[in-house]
Amino acid sequence: MAQLAAVLEDQRKSEETALITGSEAIAVACKLADVDVITAYPIRPYDTVMQYVSKLVANGELDCEYIVAEGEHSQFEIVKHASACGARVFCGSSGVGWMYAMEALTVTPALRIPMVAMVGNRALDDPGAFGVEHNDALTVRDLGWQLVWVDTAQEALDTALIAYRVAEDRRIFLPCAISCDGAFLTHSQALVKIPSQEKVNEFLPRYNRADLLLHPDNPITVAPQGNEDWVMEIRRQNYAAMERTSEVIREAYADFERIFGRSYGNPFFEEYETEDADVV
């Protein structure tokens, strides 16, 4: 017990606590993850995360390529290709903006391109609705994207770090979308424990694309034309990678608890009144 108490005290001293929003928490995660390329285009309510990212860049706290695109389609195309070139990337959108990027969103998993994106959940403007709804994120449910919903600003920061760890694992190489309820989470403030850079570096290795790196010294073809037989094989490989995420996620959460001293229990879902359930 004394040894555990000493470990927890050391972890406490290595963290600082700040009153920030869910969007700010994601921006801080980008800083801690040392993201290389970030693209932005404004649409409520996700736009707040890019405002905070831009402040970090302007203040010299985050050294990255911060690119303001002309639309969501370009936004996701830029980070897709940057990731193929070995850059750690971040992007995001909300509602119909997420829909506008659908071509890039569809192609990214099939190319085995890891990225982390934030979805500031918002209704798809039907009929003129701007409140919280999850249909934006759910459009990529069957396309090979990992989907995560977070409840708090603390969970948003922690999950973003875990998302990079899982998405960039060579066994996975799939994108991950973190859903944050618009306004309720993106704009509301809460006390958040911000881990030290040293701890994050211990938890999160650098992104290594290895032989799949798109580089002049490694000329490879990205997205070659494939017939229907190869398309089915690509789908099979995507499914196999998604099946492997369960093991990689468990590893990531175990390491997260060991390094940061925080645990979320079951990493896949939260249980409520399920003790005697046969089907959930």
Where does each model-flagged region fall?
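Short acidic-aromatic active-site loops that bind/stabilize oxyanions
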Residues: E15-I20, W149, A153, M242, ...
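Generic recognition of stable, solvent-exposed alpha-helical segments in well-folded globular domains
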Residues: T48, E155-D158, E247, E251
